[in-house]
Amino acid sequence: MQDSKEQRVHGVFEKIYKNYDQMNSVISFQQHKKWRDKTMRIMNVKEGAKALDVCCGTADWTIALAKAAGKSGEIKGLDFSENMLSVGEQKVKDGGFSQIELLHGNAMELPFDDDTFDYVTIGFGLRNVPDYLTVLKEMRRVVKPGGQVVCLETSQPEMFGFRQAYFMYFKYIMPFFGKLFAKSYKEYSWLQESARDFPGMKELAGLFEEAGLKNVKYHSFTGGVAATHIGWK
């Protein structure tokens, strides 16, 4: 079951990589950038920090971490899609971010020693992994004591009416946008499935705690369509 999901997700991102950034802006109405900016303000990344961005994709959050940590920082980005990483590599090169290293790897088995990073992030990637808890435990393992594990992800609005409209949007309109702008109806149908099945905010906070993280907090964005969860080691 896990292998099947992993293979399917890998195929999705290997196909949509060229239009991924554009589609993120289209389907979120540009809100994903604001959510990430707000999350970065909450994190308050220190200059010179060591950070890992798991499921980094095209490296937007990786680059945001590098900007916050400065030239003295050390930032790693990891993703299992080589095509997505190729887009990220070009951004890193164009921006001159010498403090960034992008790696091809698996979020379920992070290739780093225990207690390595000050911050470990995952943005719009946790819902696509085979096992949420395994990845959160791996993120906790590689973060330093006192460090932050941070997840920015789609969530499930709780307000009646808005919740129903949200799921209608994900089920019908988002795949249509995928077909219209990226010629990828099937792939964007999968993304709505993964968002639909992802835990709500309280349930995800519980998984953070089950992974061994402390003082878990979450922040809801845009009526609950997305949320940031932060836990400390």
Curated annotation (Swiss-Prot):
Task: List the SUPFAM superfamilies.
Answer: S-adenosyl-L-methionine-dependent methyltransferases
Which cysteines pair up through disulfides? They are none
Q: Which UniProt keywords are present, listed alphabetically?
A: Menaquinone biosynthesis, Methyltransferase, S-adenosyl-L-methionine, Transferase
- Asked if Transferase is a keyword of the record, the answer is yes
Which sites bind S-adenosyl-L-methionine? Answer: T58, D79, N106, A107
Enumerate the Pfam families for this protein: Ubie_methyltran
| Molecular function (Gene Ontology), one example | methyltransferase activity
- Per the UniProt entry, the Enzyme Commission number(s) are 2.1.1.163
Tell me a GO biological process for this protein.
Answer: methylation
Q: Does the keyword Iron apply?
A: no
Concerning InterPro entries, the annotation shows: MenG_heptapren, SAM-dependent_MTases_sf, UbiE/COQ5_MeTrFase, UbiE/COQ5_MeTrFase_CS
Task: Say which domain of life the source belongs to.
Answer: Bacteria
Q: Kindly state which reaction or reactions the protein catalyses.
A: a 2-demethylmenaquinol + S-adenosyl-L-methionine = a menaquinol + S-adenosyl-L-homocysteine + H(+)
UniProt xrefs under NCBIfam families:
MenG_heptapren, MenG_MenH_UbiE, PRK00216.1-4, PRK00216.1-5
Q: Report the family membership.
A: Belongs to the class I-like SAM-binding methyltransferase superfamily. MenG/UbiE family.
Q: What is the protein's known function? A: Methyltransferase required for the conversion of demethylmenaquinol (DMKH2) to menaquinol (MKH2).
Q: What PANTHER family does this protein's entry cite? A: 2-METHOXY-6-POLYPRENYL-1,4-BENZOQUINOL METHYLASE, MITOCHONDRIAL, METHYLTRANSFERASE
User: In its UniProt entry, what is this protein called?
Assistant: Demethylmenaquinone methyltransferase
Species: Bacillus subtilis (strain 168)
Q: What gene name does this entry carry?
A: menG
